[in-house]
Amino acid sequence: GAAILVEGTTNGTTADIDGNFEIKIGPGNYTLVVSYVSYKTQRLTSIVVSAGKPTVLNIEMEEAAMELESVQVVAQVKTDTDLSLLRSVRTSIQVVSGISSQQISKTLDKDASEVVKRVPGVTIQDNRFIVVRGLNQRYNNVWLNNAGTPSSETDVKAFSFDVIPSNMIDNLLIYKTGSAENPAEATGGFIKIATKNIPDANFTTAEYSIAYNDRTTLREAYFLPGKTADLAGLGQLQRGLPSGFAADLNKLPTAGRDAEALKLPGQWMAQPTTALPNQKLAIATGHRWNLTGGARLGTLTSLSYSNAYSTRSNMQNYMYERYDTQNQLPVYLYKYNADIYNRDYRIGLMHNWAYQNAYGTKLEFKNLLNVAGIQNSSNTEGWNNYRMSNFRYYSSQYSSRTTYSGQLSGKHNLNGDDNNTLDWNTGFAYANRIEPDRQNWSKKEVSAGVYQYVLPDVPSINELGRLFMNNHEFIYTAGSNWEKKTGIAALNPTFKAGVYAEYKTRNFGERSLTYRNAYGPFSTTQINALPFETLFTESYLGQGKVLSIDEQTNVANNYSAQNLLTAGYAQFTLPVGKVNLTAGLRAEFNRLMLQGYYNASSPVNVDEPEFDLFPSLNSSYNLNEKTLLRLAYSRSMNRPEFREVAPLTYYDFTEKNSVVGNPLLKNASIHNLDLRFEFYPSPTETFTIAAFYKHFTNPIEMVSIGAGSLYSFANALGATNYGVEMELKKSLNFIGLQNFSLNINASLIKSSVEFADTESERTRALQGQSPYVVNAGIYYQNDNKGISANLMYNVMGERILVAAQLNQGVVLVPDIYEMPRHVIDFSFNKKIGKQLELKFGIKDILAQDHRTQQTYDDGNGGSISLANKRYNTGRTVSLGANWKF
């Protein structure tokens, strides 16, 4: 900000991002000198300061007209500050929102999933997946440093934002309208995450935080005994099938199967432990070297480590077959209550290099690695209507997730002309998810309060078995963009063109081993008198004993898939007076390929090549220097994800439901229209209001199949989605609240799905679409005292989690809705000297329940709402410290 000096003294300060400043000085008459780069220096005389009374000054700076001879400047545009972010938002040809590293540093957010919640119009689902304008996360596209990201999940089309530590983010931008230079698969938002770059100066920082959750910390939790490698998030290396274990037990004789079964680990019982406070440690260092000829070289390295516990105690998990209108009672498919425990270890590493010379050449090499190891156990008890009995289900698993993204990129001024630039990018990304040994076992109630081990007659992975799963995804990318700014008469048109290629592969494998009753010479009483783990020793495991092992691997639960995307675009920007027009056309060729099985004798081969054109138009009209009107149109696409077209059935042992793919899914096509008014009363204040409309053809939704907890994916005939969005960033100085500011974003959305004529009586919202989203925050920042604080509020309206499927226009099972939660977060930061900063925060102060529900006809002209899932994750209190060396 501007520098303010009391003339004739050494007393002075600089203005903050909002232009506010405070100088403490005794009574008297003073002269102030105010200066800022490219503005005229101002000298204010006869400033009277009275005892006990603040003197308020409003100073307007005037731009300086400057004529310079040829000067060679080597500079790096700062992209990590609030001011630079707001400038990017205002000058962008698209509607865009974002958050800077400067704002992130004022919070206790540990990863990108928490950071992104602070972006206007954005919410997070399941603490990992982003929702823009209330639209399902499948309609977003996420890029990291100018290249696509791999899916970190095996069963959903989404990028998991919790793999990127917050201290590695330079800025995060969300484009809400399309343009030719961006991928066509971005209907909700196109999210670009930029990691940090060349530092301004050499530095080293260390950060530590500790957190207490009132539902988890210092309470009892249950896990299988851990492994040494768990601490590094690499526990899969010490789990899984033993070396040399047979590839297919069905090919072995009985004695061979028994011998292989004894090689497997015999630990099944989760042991009690105390959930420790969540902790995070991060160390970052940056160095820069000024080279000859004005060139610079910089490197930045960041390492973070965290461990966290979470618990869902007494989680309600009910599924209904129907509602009995005669007796006014629900008929349950199952009625469970569960305790679920998680222990999470993560390591994050970022290592970036950058080189920049005086002739407009910049080279970057960026690397991001995240390793997460999550140990989970669940105890579920309740009524199973299929089996007509009460059961207790026990499940333990370890899952490992690794995500890596590496990119080499460059930008060049052609012929030394910064109006004629070429940039390029090559990238490689990898993600895996490995579950090396999920163990499930159960007990059945045989009389009131008396439970016995379930030794299935028919093999059942849910009742007694082990599951081994692995998923590996690779992405190779390359792209280049050429931009030419020309001066034709009084116009300054810009032409931009580029190409992009992406090749993605996935290999998914699952192996299922189950145990069944061996009908040996043991009575039920004898068996149940034994500790459960004893059943897996040589005396009881094998043919003619208590248990025998079976290979139940289903070939349909394994698949390979590939996707090739090539794209090219041309875009032209023409400023005409107060009007700025940008028109573009993007061409994309996409080929989705998948090799799988319905069953051993019915292979599935998907090969779907398609070519399409995606026009876009972004226009803006500058009503005056502070007011802007935007109008935008674009066509976008939403393609099925690998998992959605793979015919495998995935059973979620925690949630107790199954999801099966649909190889017949079609692409969804969307037309988007946006109108937005923007007002910038000051460099740090904004007010915007927007209207948007989207029409979908063949939208992809998750639907229930028949009665029960089996879900799949299907195309609806069509859908419309329209609404309004308001955003306000306002300093509260005008009402006497110095250093306070207000941020509000609210969206109201109406959506409806189109059905075939035979189903015209059915009306509902688009699956995953919320009718409203509200984000609000009040901020306090006093740079002189080194204090900042904020209070954040968020709510998202009820939305369909799983849509009902129709049969001849009849709803078989009602839609399952995710219900609203009001969330309030608070954080407080205090700087002590120039090196230490303390942070305090409370997340989810209200700690409202997470709920899903269905609504049934009660038979009397009314309706009744029944809860499916209900649980509470509690509130979290955090304390952290950041030290700059």
Indicate where each model-derived feature is located.
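Periplasm-facing N-terminal accessory domains of Gram-negative outer-membrane beta-barrel systems
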Residues: 1-70, 74
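Periplasmic N-terminal accessory/gating domains of Gram-negative outer-membrane beta-barrel systems
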Residues: 48, 53, 77-79, 83, ...
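Surface-exposed extracellular loop regions of Gram-negative outer-membrane beta-barrel proteins
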Residues: 148, 432-434, 450-455, 527-548, ...
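Transmembrane beta-barrel wall of Gram-negative outer-membrane proteins
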Residues: 262-378, 404, 617
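Signature of Gram-negative outer-membrane beta-barrel scaffolds
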Residues: 372, 463-465, 469, 481-626, ...
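Outer membrane beta-barrel strand-and-loop segments of large Gram-negative receptors
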Residues: 467, 471, 478-479, 527, ...
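C-terminal beta-signal and adjacent terminal beta-strands/loops
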Residues: 519, 795-804, 830-885
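Gram-negative outer-membrane beta-barrel transporters
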Residues: 691-696, 712-803
